[in-house]
Amino acid sequence: MPRRRRRASRPIRRRRRARRSTAVRRRRRVVRRRR
């Protein structure tokens, strides 16, 4: 049973990190194009 709880909390953390990395990559690309 403890394995099921760990698996549910792992995907949630990966989704939050993926959203932050996409926002940072889009902002860096915009700064390079403007310069």
Curated annotation (Swiss-Prot):
Keywords: Chromosome, Developmental protein, Differentiation, DNA condensation, DNA-binding, Nucleosome core, Nucleus, Phosphoprotein, Spermatogenesis
Post-translational modification note: Phosphorylated in immature sperm. Dephosphorylated in mature sperm allowing a stronger interaction with DNA.
Chain positions found as Phosphoserine: S9, S21
UniProt keyword DNA-binding present: yes
Predominant place of localization: nucleus
Places the protein is found: Nucleus; Chromosome
GO terms, biological process: cell differentiation; mitotic chromosome condensation; nucleosome assembly; spermatogenesis
Signal peptide stretch: none
Keyword check for Disulfide bond: no
Region (Disordered): 1-35
Cystine pairs: none
One Gene Ontology cellular component: nucleus
GO MF annotation, one: DNA binding
Functional note: Protamines substitute for histones in the chromatin of sperm during the haploid phase of spermatogenesis. They compact sperm DNA into a highly condensed, stable and inactive complex.
Misc note: Two isoforms exist, a major form and a minor form. This is the minor form.
Protein name as catalogued: Sperm protamine alpha isoform 2
Organism listed in the record: Scomber scombrus
